[in-house]
Amino acid sequence: YGQAIQTLYEKNRRYDSSNQIPMLPISLFKTEELKSIPDSEIFKVITSSGTSGVASHLYLDAFNAQNQQLALYTIVKDFIGSSRLPMLIVDTPDILKNRDAFNARGAAILGFSIFAKRKYYALKPDLSVDLESIRTFIQTYRNQPVLIFGFTFMIWQYLCEALANYPGLIDLSNAILIHGGGWKKMQDRAVSPHEYKKRLY
């Protein structure tokens, strides 16, 4: 960060407060390999979903990768508690099998899997809705809290829109939904955050 500030802005300037420190354009993570560690210490590369056309890459060493996982656990447990819950993942299990195509969706599924007592997938390999898997999930855990996880646009396109054709199939009033990423695709579909929440309720 310091090197970037020195390159882009006035060199050797002293800042008296954090309000004076310049911001960096987030697009730099898409166009440059920004690293604060040597290549030999790279433990994990986080890749964004790239819904805007170009993916960002963040390079972590083992220490910061562990801290990232601990931070995720600390934040999420405030919402769902410390117990693991049955989880319905709005994606296909195949996304974890092809390491060459591994992306932000796969990384997010792996990250949030620490909260799952048992995992079910809502989609088949061809991204069609797996009704049998969803029915099994609902019937098995009808009277207890459950967790649903997926990317924002995946939940909209493959769960909300598809299951609208099967009214009465799902009762997810006992579910906690966690979604993230993919808002660019929602904007392309002219779906506002308000409309998204309204459909889910």
Model-predicted segments: where are they?
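Active-site diphosphate/adenylate-binding microenvironment
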Residues: 2-45, 56-58, 69, 74-80
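Short, charged/polar "capping" segments at the starts of alpha-helices
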Residues: 3-4, 95-102, 186-187
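Generic beta-strand structural signal
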Residues: 44, 83-88, 118-119, 144-146
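Ser/Thr-glycine-rich phosphate-binding loops at phosphate-binding pockets of nucleotides
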Residues: 47-55, 152, 181
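Conserved adenylate-forming
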Residues: 49-101, 112-113
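Glycine-rich, phosphate-binding/catalytic loops in enzymes
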Residues: 65, 106, 165-167
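Phosphate-/polyanion-interacting regions in eukaryotic proteins
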Residues: 93-94, 105, 124
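Active-site glycine/GP-rich loop and adjacent strand/helix microenvironment
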Residues: 110-201
